[in-house]
């Protein structure tokens, strides 16, 4: 009988450890970076819809998404160079917690006016600008962000 109780207690402890270990990852946000470096409006639209689908699937509280834009990808933020629906999609995604990483190298090299880059009706903020889009992608991947290229 004593052996039975010892084995039962050991199994109880083992199952609790397994349960604790399985639940350790709960509450941890999935980290994802979406990469935009094309001026193709269809790619912009598809990528922005992918981000919304991602949020819908896992819940905005369970995911941290950063959209990094560089090179021709900055056309997403320029009136007259992108579809109006994409402006609205980006604004809606920002309201859900999606962050932007807008490449300062591109802004500088293309002599863009930061005040002409916008998200919906709002201008981009200094906090949306990163020194280099490609450097930001590498940094985020080294921090465990999953990489998605629409």
Where are these regions (language model features)?
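Secreted/extracellular ectodomain signature
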Residues: 21-150
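N-terminal export/membrane-targeting signals
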Residues: 1-24
């Amino acid at each position: 009988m004593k052996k039975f109780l010892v084995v039962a207690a050991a199994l109880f402890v083992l199952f609790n450890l397994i349960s604790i270990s399985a639940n350790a990852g709960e509450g941890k946000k999935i980290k994802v970076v979406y990469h935009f470096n094309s001026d193709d409006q269809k790619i912009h639209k598809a990528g922005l819809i992918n981000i919304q689908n991602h949020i819908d699937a896992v819940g905005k509280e369970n995911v941290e998404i950063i959209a990094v834009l560089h090179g021709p990808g900055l056309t997403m933020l320029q009136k007259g160079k992108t579809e109006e629906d994409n402006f609205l999609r980006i604004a809606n995604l920002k309201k859900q917690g999606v962050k932007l990483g807008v490449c300062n190298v591109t802004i500088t090299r293309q002599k863009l006016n930061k005040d002409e880059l916008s998200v919906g009706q709002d201008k981009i903020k200094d906090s949306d600008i990163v020194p280099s889009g490609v450097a930001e992608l590498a940094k985020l991947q080294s921090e465990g962000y999953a990489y998605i290229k629409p």
